[in-house]
Amino acid sequence: MQASAPTTSFRLSFANPPGLYDPRPNGYSHLAMVQGPARLVYAAGQGGEDTQGYLAPDFATQVRQALANLRTALAAAGARPQDVAKLTVLIVDHTQDRLRIFSEQIQALWADAPTPACTLIPVPRLALDGMLFEIEATAAVAA
């Protein structure tokens, strides 16, 4: 299965090749490919802190806030979630329940658009006390 995000001078496409399991229920694609001239946008890891630096104590709220922070960072560079080619996700004390929460939020943010390639890394701790989730992104936009 292959789909493309709408672009003007380049093409960002995603694929889930035969012979690999279907990753879409977990909110990602196996491959992201950028063809043609593009400007790459690298968003640093976004955590679940609000504009005052407050971190909610629960995982789901941190995921929602981190994704909102990611949207804000991308927008500042002229990018949208659908322009993201690759995500790296860090989850403290990873469980299947936390994967479900993350997957549901990613699917809600991307809606019907194909989801990017993604690597999820379980970690014992993140930069700030109480931080449970962090997400970084690489996006491609028209040059």
Model-based region annotation:
Residues 1-68, 72-85, 92-143:
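N-terminal presequence-like segments and the immediate start of the first folded domain
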